[in-house]
UniProtKB/Swiss-Prot annotation:
Residues 42-51 have a biased composition (Low complexity). It comes from Mus musculus. Its cofactor is Zn(2+). The gene is Pappa. The keyword Zinc applies. This is Pappalysin-1.
Length: 1624
């Protein structure tokens, strides 16, 4: 529910209105409508906001330090720097722009083969190709597989492909069958320095971030490559040969030939990678001389070498709110300070302004003075106990035009007259929703039309509001009769229209407006403090005047003010969650869930004055006790509510400091909310650093200046303040350009939000797409208040259609400069959950705006931010805030404790063992803030950050730094999913590290498998059948244990295809969720060993809840016994919160026990996905067998059967296990004896518990126990089986394994023609790790001499011999009269090259004859040619001798080698007359012959239907017979030939349906899906459509029939192997 941690967390959609407004009904209901303000008109067909949206007294209030995180690298410094104040010197870094600057290592280094460590400091830009290669080891030889080697980079981990990008490390040794990729534990953070390290020791891959181990894998084993292929390996930096290029800075780079330990990596990181040369250190780079070691790729560029200034601060000031929070005031440390320090809750005076509207004569006010005065008294009384007092200002406005109109609080005016009754718009003065809420009679409208009278029975949208007469001020009183939402005279206004008319400054007062709701149910609406509008004219509180200042209703305003000051409803955690799986559900009072107050018990929404009873919407709560029903933030009546809790009071004071300082007369600056932190010490000094003030300001605020936008370094950061687009605006205003102004406020990136601009907002859904046609597409123009020379641009693109990959959505960004020049930045790769950042350091001139272009009509843009270079002229005159350090005992007078722009202080006046308290005061002008919380430091003792864990001070870890995100927080608390060991702490992300530790046995499926309690046995499904079987979602995927990587998802829109690889769901259901008829889906799983069930366990991947619905899905479960009897286990609610679902089986003890063999599961939602079903039974205990034991028998748990009772336990037989060593506890195998079985090298344990349950154990040994004369486990050591060698193990080879493929066996290989064996040993050996040995010979692909090309001469002499390397060329030249096909008619190329390809064959090359154009059509049928129209062909027309005798020459022409004729034909003398009028025309053709019918005359031919085209078809073929693959010739005219025949013959001409003008628009149109229309421009095949996903139009078009991929040239119909390669 948060935005990104490095930028302002604002913009929670209200749980009440879904659009940023909190509301309070009149004890009846909450209004669910999203209310968005309209914008001024901007001319026809455009959508813009050309007026400023209101002045802010402060910038969008960032959390303290969040501004800084945008600009400042978070770096660990050298330990030596801890005692000094001087910043570290700048170091060099390479900047890669992502446009072909990848480097390759040119130094003659022997790259590590067996183990290595790679370390790099980098800062990545937001938005990358996926994958983006930071560095990688590749194989350049043609005779090896290209996916071998290792890569470090960034890629997306989500099925959707444009979200959740993470750092990754992938490796595939030359012996491995597949690549292993491990990912970091979270998305990468753009613009932040990070230290990455990757290690491999021949057994384990590990990835480290900032010294913390975040991922590991044991899949790859052994060496990386053999010495034989050393020369094939190339080390790349900044990208790959396939242009998977990285964008960002790379600073230090080092490569070791050993796997460094975590402690060594932490040490390397702190020394910034600078080492004295060591034998195991192969390469360390600080970019002093890049060209000496690295070279750019062919036709590539070199990255820029820059100086990077590491920030001098050691304290990470990036504080995150909890998952359910929004701003700094939700951070648990910050709000704890406000709870604990009374000084932070000192008296505050807040100004508020009541907007009271009168008529023009200053009469008939909206509310009376008595109401205003009484409400003010009640307000003052309610807040007086909490040190908040209110200063009233009343603004009287005389305007009859406003006073006589109805002001609507919660009605979207665009819904009036939309043929659907909207209760919130059902009011007398809206004509009862424009007639939509009335059953209308049909009056004689035509008789009353334009009769000069407003006829109320015709005053509805259906009758155009009486033809407009009811909105004519010359005819009627429009304040009572005008209901037309499009009329400027209408009798009602939306409350935001009122705000736009008044345009009251929201930065100095809390504005109180009055508006009505339909049926007067809505009592109030408030603006959250994190909304964009909070300090603008569109903010404030809207109240119902009928309740304002009325006894019994005065607490409504107090409730709404609570919302404005950051308070949620006390029932948020129960009644305002999206589902019972919502992470914000409150089960106990907490700072992190529900209403974020830990002194309000969970409660559901109700209006009674007492604890509520349980209800249907309480997620299993059986009762609520000690609920805060008397709280102002409940829905109880005024005679019940009377207080705020201390936590709520702290939140209100925090928001008054964070956001609303400008509402207060006091000029006191905001405090530093947290205690200063000790970041270093020496024997005689201590170093302190502290957080910025809570409001994020660094300079004194001055009216009319930009100082409130300036950060440390005098860098100006501003969001767009004016937006426009040529795209039309929707009437609701949602997705309008205005939504892209201000700071980002989308609550959930990657989900569509009305708080963004989208080009599709007002597109008519009935129009044919696309809305954004190529090549330009749609664009959004954003302007910034202050033109500046930019350093960087940040854009939040929060939604991209699944039809587009990350690179196609934003096809250009243009910078608009003051000089009038537009600078194009080109297409950009975007992620929907990571903002796009673009460096603009080279622009060098002032920019005032940007234009963002897109081809994706569903794209959504949330915000844009422009950052200046250092020392911006706009910030140079700003006065920095000062900080005063208060110490107890006090500092000496001569010690400077007053600092500015430096949040660091060194105290050298210390005594060993003395206790010191430090507080920070912020100074602005003559005003001082309240002191910060105190830091208590005992000189000579420990502190958080010294590497020693002081448990008595609450420390859980200490990694010797003050940085978050590395497993140990800056407050020395262990971070979620990390475990820290040793001192100083070494932290690792434990979930998925391959080690099953005691604390994660019950929680980590990845490391420990599915947890089974002691005494039980879980049996997973061995077979399955399903109701909706399909090859896309087969039922067999639920067999066995569920995939460890799957996470349960709730509130989904649809299920991606990737889910069907791990879980079953009814994927054949294609109709929309809302139109789904009642359907029962079922899954039945079978188990190989029938058992007495103790429980059924069901693992979910989705819980069936739909994104737009609150309904919880239920599931019905039955057990089937061995007699096919059904046993009902009841109905159960599905929830990801309770995953897996464990259903206990209760047996009726009055009935016999039964063995269960199957489980039947049924449900009704197509959004339920199940990944596994288990049957839990008692281990070594079977009640059914036990009950069958006869007299003299006893139940044996080992045998699980009845055995004859014996008083003396029997010994076990001698344990014999081949290929194993045994270590037994005794020489005698009596009852209870144990033996440890360890397999020899190359053998693996096989454990057999009974005939059906068999599994392999990877572990090296196992212990077996003698129980009642029988070993409890049957164990064998089987040889490792390497399987048939993979075809990539030796490229271009075939394998023969006559000895088998188990441990120690050998296979031979032979090179496939034309590959040549390079080396002598063509054998492979199966090794103990289950992989084949490195080959000691290779099959080098060579081409034989190229075959002769007809009609061409070989020009390259060496090509007449054999043995040509892959990639070599041979040159040919076509013989005279022949040319290369495809060359232009004007310049026919004769020379061409063929290349030796990777499969050992040559590229095809051909020479085709030169051809001449056909002679003019009037000679058709009269000439004979010796060889058609090809070179050297002779064509002649026989004329009578009289032609030659009269000197006209012979009628013979020759085709010359340049493609022209040697002459031209003439009409013979005897060829006289004219053609007869054309007949045999098809009925749908028409002919125009303006020149008559003489020889050579032409007649234009066309179709009567303008949507058809005229074509030629063969004889006896009609239009109905045309197959889709036929491309008939178009014909536009016929000509009368010299033989007095029409050509083409009119009878062969037909009319066929023409092509619709939507080819190449990314939608497959059935009418165009034929060769005649170029198969709709490629839109009907996945391989040819630009979006790589076929979208039929209309949606009902069958993808297997009319909208199928028919293009024979598409890859789908090409049998050639088209596999790509991994590793970028």
């Amino acid at each position: 529910m948060r935005l990104w941690s490095w930028v302002l967390r604002l913009g929670l959609l209200s749980a009440a209105l879904g659009c940023g407004l909190a509301e309070r009904p009149r004890r009846v209901r909450r209004d669910p409508r999203a209310v968005r303000p309209p914008r001024p008109a901007a001319g026809p067909a455009t959508c813009a906001t050309r007026a400023a949206r209101g002045r802010r007294a402060s910038p969008p209030p960032p959390p303290g330090g969040a501004w800084e995180a945008v600009r400042v690298p978070r770096r660990r410094q050298q330990r030596a720097a801890r005692g000094a104040e001087e910043p570290s010197p700048p170091s060099r870094a390479l900047y890669f722009s992502g446009r072909g600057e990848q480097l390759r290592l040119r130094a003659d280094l022997e790259l590590p083969r067996d183990a290595f460590t790679l370390q790099v400091w980098l800062r990545a830009e937001g938005g990358q190709k996926s994958p983006a290669v930071i560095t990688g080891l590749y194989d350049k030889c043609s005779y090896t597989s290209r996916d071998r080697g290792w890569v470090m980079g960034i890629h997306t981990t989500s099925d959707q492909g444009n979200r959740d990008p993470r750092y990754f490390f992938s490796l595939k040794t030359d012996r491995a069958r597949k690549v292993t990729t491990i990912d970091a534990h979270r998305s990468y953070l753009p613009g932040q320095w990070v230290h990455l390290a990757a290690t491999y020791d021949g057994r384990l891959m590990k990835l480290y971030m900032n010294g913390a181990q975040v991922a590991t894998s044991a899949e790859q084993v052994g060496g990386i490559f053999s010495p034989l292929t050393q020369k094939c390996k190339v080390l790349m930096l900044g990208g790959s040969a396939l242009n998977h290029n990285f964008r960002g800075h790379i600073e230090h780079f080092s490569l070791w030939k050993v796997a460094r330990t975590q402690r060594e990596i932490v040490s390397d990181m702190e020394t910034r990678g600078l080492h004295t040369p060591l034998p195991q250190l192969l390469l360390q780079e600080n970019w002093d001389n890049v060209k000496r070691t690295w070279s750019p790729m062919k036709d590539g560029n070199s990255p820029q070498v820059e100086f990077s200034n590491a920030h001098g601060f050691l304290l990470d000031t990036n504080l995150e709110p909890p998952l359910c929070g929004q701003t700094l005031c939700d951070n648990t440390e910050v709000i704890s300070s406000y709870n604990q320090l009374p000084s932070f809750r000192q008296p505050k005076v807040v100004r508020y302004r009541v907007v009271n509207i009168y008529d023009d004569h200053h009469e008939n006010p909206t509310v009376s003075w008595q109401q205003i005065d009484f409400q003010h008294q009640q307000l003052a009384e309610a807040f007086q106990h909490y040190n908040i007092s209110w200063e009233l200002e009343v603004l009287n406005i005389n305007s009859s035009s406003l006073r006589h109109r109805l002001i609507l609080a919660n009605c979207d005016i665009s819904k009036i007259g939309d043929e659907k009754c909207d209760p919130e718009c059902n009011h007398t003065l809206t004509g009862h929703d424009g007639g939509d809420c009335r059953q209308l009679r049909y009056p004689a409208f035509m008789k009353k039309q334009q009769n000069g009278v407003c006829d109320m029975d015709c005053n509805y949208e259906r009758f155009n509001f009486d033809g407009g007469e009811c909105c004519d001020p010359d005819i009627t009183d429009v304040t009572k009769t005008c209901f037309d939402p499009d009329s400027p005279h209408r009798a009602y206004l939306d409350v935001n229209e009122l705000k736009n008319i008044l345009r009251l400054d929201g930065s100095t007062h809390l504005n109180i407006f009055f508006a009505n709701s339909s049926e007067e149910e809505l009592a109030g609406v408030a603006t959250w403090p994190w909304d964009k509008e909070a300090l603008m004219h569109l903010g404030g509180i809207v109240l119902n005047p009928s309740f304002y200042g009325i006894p019994g209703h005065t607490h409504t305003m107090i409730h709404e003010i609570g919302h404005s000051l950051g308070l949620y409803h006390i029932f948020r955690g129960i009644s305002e969650i999206q589902s019972c799986s919502d992470p914000c559900m409150e089960t106990e009072p907490s700072f992190e869930t529900g209403d974020l107050c830990n002194d309000t018990n969970p409660a559901p929404k109700h209006k009674f004055c007492g604890d509520p009873g349980p209800g249907n919407d309480t997620c299993g709560f059986h009762g609520f006790f000690n609920t805060p029903y008397n709280n102002f933030m409940s829905y109880a009546d005024d005679d019940c509510t009377d207080s705020f809790t201390p936590n709520q009071v702290s939140r209100m004071h925090c928001y008054l400091d964070l956001v609303y300082q400008s509402w207060q007369p006091s000029r006191k600056p905001a405090p530093v909310a947290l205690a200063p932190q000790v970041v270093g010490h020496t024997m005689d000094s201590v170093m302190l650093e502290w957080f910025p003030p809570i409001d994020g300001h660094f300079f004194e605020r001055e009216l009319g200046s930009a100082c409130d936008l300036c950060l440390e370094g005098r860098i100006l950061v501003q969001y767009a303040f004016n937006a426009s687009s040529p795209m039309p605006c929707g009437p609701s205003g949602h997705w309008s350009p205005r939504e892209a102004e201000g700071h980002p406020d989308v609550e959930q990136p990657c989900k569509s939000s009305v708080r963004t601009w989208s080009p599709n907002s007002a597109v008519n859904p009935h129009t044919v797409p696309p809305a954004c046609p190529e090549p330009q597409g749609c664009y959004l123009e954003l302007e910034f208040r202050y033109p500046l020379v930019p350093e960087s641009l940040t854009i939040w693109v929060t939604f991209v259609s699944s039809d587009w990959d990350s690179s196609g959505a934003v096809n250009d960004i243009k910078l608009l400069t003051i000089s009038g020049k537009n600078i194009s930045l080109g297409p950009q790769n975007v992620f929907c959950d990571i903002p796009l950042t673009i460096r603009l350091r080279d622009v060098g001139e002032e920019v005032y705006g940007i234009q963002i272009y897109t081809l994706d009509e569903h794209l959504e843009i949330d915000a844009a931010m422009l950052t200046s270079t250092v020392d911006s002229p706009l910030c140079l005159q700003c006065k920095p805030l000062q900080y005063k350090v208060l110490r107890d005992p006090p500092l000496l007078e001569d010690v400077a404790s007053l600092l500015h722009l430096n949040r660091r202080f060194m105290d050298t006046d210390l005594k060993l063992g003395s206790v010191y308290q430090y507080r920070i005061i912020t100074i602005s002008g003559n005003e001082e803030s309240e002191p910060s919380p105190a830091a208590i430091y005992t000189h000579g003792s420990g502190y958080c950050g010294d590497g020693v864990i002081q448990k008595d001070q609450g420390e859980e870890c200490d990694d010797m730094n003050k940085v978050n995100g590395d497993g140990c927080s800056l407050f020395c608390k262990q971070e979620v999913s990390f475990n820290c060991i040793d001192e100083p702490s070494r932290c690792y992300f434990h979930d998925g590290d391959g080690m099953c530790e005691e604390f994660e046995q019950k929680t980590s499926i990845k490391d420990c498998g599915v947890y089974t309690p002691q005494g039980f046995l879980d049996q997973w499904a061995s077979n399955a059948s399903v109701s909706h079987q399909d090859q896309q979602c087969p039922g067999w995927v639920v067999i066995g244990q569920p995939a460890a990587s799957q996470v349960c998802r709730t509130k989904v829109i649809d299920l991606s295809e990737g889910i069907s690889q791990h879980a079953w769901y009814p994927c054949t259901i294609t109709y929309p969720y809302y139109h789904l008829p009642q359907t029962t889906f079922w899954l039945q799983t079978y188990f190989s060993q029938p058992m007495v069930a103790a429980a059924v366990i069901i693992h979910l991947v989705t819980d069936g809840t739909y994104y737009g619905d609150q309904k919880q899905e239920t599931i019905s479960v039955q057990l089937l016994d061995t007699k096919d009897q059904s046993h009902d286990l009841g109905l159960h609610v599905l929830s990801c919160r309770n995953n897996p679902l464990i259903i206990p089986v209760v047996h009726d003890l009055s009935q016999p026990f039964y063995h269960s063999q199957a489980v039947h599961v049924s449900f009704s939602s197509p959004l339920v996905a199940i990944s596994g079903v288990a049957l839990r039974s008692f281990d070594n205990f079977d009640p059914v067998t036990l009950s069958s034991c006869q007299r003299g028998e006893t139940y044996s748990p080992a045998e699980q059967s009845c055995v004859h009772f014996a008083c003396q336990a029997a010994d076990c037989p001698e344990l014999a296990v081949g290929n194993a060593s045994l270590n037994c506890s005794s020489n005698h195998h009596y009852h209870g004896a144990q033996c440890t079985v360890s397999c020899q090298t190359g053998y693996v344990l096989q454990i057999q518990r009974d005939d059906e349950l068999i599994k392999s154990q990877v572990g090296p040994s196992i212990t077996v126990t003698c129980t009642e004369g029988k070993w409890n486990k049957q164990v064998a050591c089987e040889p490792v089986d390497c399987g048939i060698p993979d075809h990539h193990h030796v490229y271009a080879a075939s394998f023969s394994c006559p000895e088998g493929t188990t441990f120690g066996r050998r296979c031979s290989f032979q090179c496939r023609h034309p590959a040549q064996l390079k080396g002598n040993n063509s054998f492979l050996t199966c090794m103990e790790d289950g992989l084949w040995s490195f080959p000691e010979a290779l099959c080098e692909l060579m081409c034989l001499a190229p075959p002769p090309v007809p009609n061409a001469d070989l020009q390259t002499a060496r090509c007449r011999e054999n043995k040509h390397k892959v990639g070599s060329f041979c040159k040919y030249k076509c013989k005279p009269g022949y040319h290369v096909p495809g060359s232009s008619r004007k310049s026919k190329k004769r020379a061409f090259k063929t290349q030796c390809t990777q499969d050992g064959s040559w590229q095809e090359g051909t020479c085709v004859p030169v051809t001449c154009d056909p002679p003019p059509p009037k000679f058709h049928g009269l000439y004979q040619c010796t060889n058609g129209f090809q070179f050297n062909s002779e064509c002649r027309i026989k004329c009578e001798d009289s032609d030659a005798s009269q000197g006209r020459g012979s009628n013979i022409i020759h085709c010359r080698k340049d493609g022209t004729w040697s002459g031209s034909f003439h009409v013979c003398r005897e060829m006289q007359g004219q053609c007869s009028a054309p007949n045999q025309l098809n009925s749908n053709l028409k002919l125009q012959c303006p020149d008559g019918y003489a020889i050579g005359s032409e007649c234009a031919i066309s179709c009567l239907d303008h949507n058809s085209e005229s074509i030629i078809l063969p004889v006896n073929l009609t239009v109905r017979d045309i197959p889709h693959w036929m491309n008939p010739t178009r014909v536009q005219r016929i000509v009368c030939t010299a033989g007095l025949q029409w050509y083409p013959h009119p009878a062969l001409i037909h009319c066929v349906k023409g092509c619709e003008p939507f080819m190449g628009d990314n939608y497959c149109d059935a009418i165009n899906n034929r060769a005649f229309c170029n198969y709709d421009g490629g839109d009907c095949c996945t391989s040819t459509v630009k979006t790589k996903k076929v979208t039929p139009f209309p949606m009902s078009c069958d993808l297997q029939n009319d909208c199928a991929c028919r293009d024979p040239e598409a890859q789908e119909h090409n049998r050639k192997d088209l596999r790509g390669y991994s590793h970028g």
